[in-house]
């Protein structure tokens, strides 16, 4: 089985923006009969009361992906959360031959770092499929440095310690 993880992105209106649709289009092209699609994104816009993953699921079904092949991760509020909660879903339940992580190209270096930290050794990742989208307002170098600090001192794949740090030290998740 191949697993395709698609990282969400904040939805500001009643519909997905072009960047998120582009990520999904890349994932849909990767999909085959041996694939499962894990759509990752929680409720980041409380005006909508729907998770990013639910919006993505609707788009995938409308574009031919069978509902039975879709897994939802609806707790994450950022990329670190994407990695943590996807790892929690996959560990012990799925044994994918390869895990494709799909996001925007500018976002892939950080995504790769975070997912390898959360999943640890024993998983084969492919980070080569991304949606080319220019976001000049995004400071990825700063975001990567914040991710490095978050994971500092934690062993790769130690999901219990990573999850504990997430809920005790990450401002988006404290107290959950």
Give a label for each model feature.
Residues 1-146, 150:
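A structural signal for short, hydrophobic/glycine-enriched beta-strand patches
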Residues 152-176:
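Charged phosphate-binding loop/patch that engages nucleotide di/tri-phosphates or the phosphate backbone
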């Amino acid at each position: 089985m191949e697993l395709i993880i698609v990282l969400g992105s904040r939805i500001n209106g009643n519909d997905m923006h072009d960047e998120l649709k582009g990520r999904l289009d890349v994932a849909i092209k990767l999909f085959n009969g041996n694939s499962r699609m894990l759509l990752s994104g929680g409720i980041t816009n409380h005006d909508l009361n729907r998770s990013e993953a639910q919006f993505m699921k609707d788009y995938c079904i409308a574009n031919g992906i069978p509902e039975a092949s879709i897994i939802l991760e609806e707790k994450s509020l950022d990329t670190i959360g994407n990695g943590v909660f996807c790892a929690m879903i996959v560990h012990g339940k799925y044994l994918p031959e390869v895990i494709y992580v799909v996001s925007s190209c500018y976002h892939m270096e950080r995504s790769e770092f975070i997912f390898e930290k959360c999943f640890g050794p024993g998983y084969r990742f492919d980070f080569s499929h991304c949606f080319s989208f220019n976001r000049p307002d995004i400071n990825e170098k700063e975001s990567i440095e914040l991710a490095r600090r978050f994971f500092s001192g934690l062993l790769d794949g130690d999901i219990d310690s990573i999850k504990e740090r997430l809920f005790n030290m990450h401002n988006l998740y404290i107290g959950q």
